[in-house]
Structures are given as C-alpha cells and as structure tokens.
Amino acid sequence: MSASDDLYTTAVHAGRASVHALGKHAPPIDLSSTYPFDDMDAAARSLTELAHGASTAETPVYARLHNPTVARAEQAVAELEGATDTVAYASGMAAVTAVLMATRTLRDDRATPHVVAVRPIYGTTDHLLTSNLLDVDVSWAAPDAIAESMRPATALVMIETPANPTLDLVDIQAVVDQAGDVPVVVDSTFAPPVIQRPLEHGATLSLHSATKFLGGHGDVMGGVVSTSDADWAAALRHVRVATGALLHPHAAYLMHRSMPTLPARVERAQSTATALADRLQAHPAVQAVHF
C-alpha cells in the first residue's frame, strides 16, 4: 500500500474507534452541557484533572472541560498529523492565541515570552503579535536569520508555510535547525496533513484553521493545534478550559465528517489549481502567478 493509500484509509477511519465501540457507523453529536455523576469525589477529581489539561477523566463533568464529539474530531486530526494529541478551538485565531498563552505558562519564571516570527504570516496573527493584546515580546526575522534573533528568553518560533494569501514558502527543517531547543509552531492551514505534516520535520506544534481545508465545505469555523509533546498538549487544553475558547460539538461533528473526503478534495483542488495556474501563466495580461 502506498503512502497515498495509507492517508486515504487513515482519513476514513481516523477518530472512529469509539464510534465502532458504540455499535454505530456515523459519529453521534453529544450536545450535553453537563454530565451526571454518582460519586462526588470522582467528579471533583475529574474537574481538577481536566481543568489542568488532562485529556480524559472518570467523568466529563462539564462540556467546557471535555466533550466526546470534540474529542473524536481531535483524535482524527492527530492521526492524520502523526501526533499524539490535537486540541481544538472555536477558530484558527483562538488556536493561535492559545499557543501564545501556553508559551507563557510553560516558562518556569512566567516572564514575558520572546517570540521570533517570520513574515509574511496570516494578517490577524500579525496583528495579534503587534497589537499588545497579549504580553509577548516579538522579533521579526527572515527565515534564514532566525538564529541571530534568538535570546535567552526566546520561548517560541512562529512561521506559516505556505503563507496566506501570498503562498510564500519556508523550509520547516531549516527553521527547526536554527531554533535549537526552542519550540517551533507552524501554521500549516494552506497545506493540510495530506500534503504537509510539520511534526515530521521537527516542529513542536502544527496549527490549522479548520475553517479552510479541514472543514472544507464553508459551513464550519474552528482551529486545531497538534503536538506530540505532552506538556504542550496539557498547557493548550488548560488554556482552552480557562478561556472558554472551545469548539462547539456541532462544529466538531462537521469537521470530523469532512475528514474521509480530505485527501480526495485536496487532490482535486491541487489538480484544478495547477491547470488554472498554467493557463494564467500563459496569458499575456497576467504579470505574475503565485502557485
């Protein structure tokens, strides 16, 4: 079986093990806001564990802490990314914000984190980094000059590749090599996991606006961050619980529903885009084509 076949199969089955255990074919939508429990001590333990970033507990207690529909969608993305954990949010920008907030909580001194970022980057991400809405110290660097921008307080390197909407590309592995022990987050929204998996190139975090390819049908907003670092996963869930920026179960259901067709959709989109780019490049009225 080829790698392409593997991805097609993974996309169909990802996040569905618990569905099969329920004796169902399609994932159900769990819209409960609270969950009953018989043991107050177990509920208290679960609340504490989930509030501090655990992925599961004896009981969900409250939908802001855990929701089975959201968890299945997260598992599906994690399997496609080759990650151990995915944390879902209400939007791509909620995911970006959570990464920046988690960066601070993971520092022992809780000092203002220094972030090295590469432009071009998604416009609202750029705004978030420069607007002082978050207590983050940002240095902008060229992709080949990241090492020169690093400081002892540098807590994160942030890139987007391909960039939205310019399609500028950044060599992920080259950035990771320059970053050393500093975590690298890659906004890979324009290159879904069937095209690019940043963790395979050494990135600590892979981020997507699920509103684009992952949702794929123009009817869902969401954001996801995938990682195989347990501390990061816990910190990201902690931020989500504390800020309430959770993905609604119905949106999670729609995103998960879209996973089986992701490889086919991306393949067809790439084929159409290639044909269109070829035609535009040959047109005398077109000065430049970014593809």
Predicted regions, residues:
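Short clusters of hydrophobic/aromatic residues that line enzyme substrate/ligand-binding pockets
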Residues: 12, 62, 214
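N-terminal glycine-rich, Lys/His-bearing helix-loop that initiates the first secondary-structure elements
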Residues: 1-57
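Structural beta-strand/beta-sheet cores of well-ordered domains, especially the beta-sheet scaffolds
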Residues: 27, 33, 221-222, 287
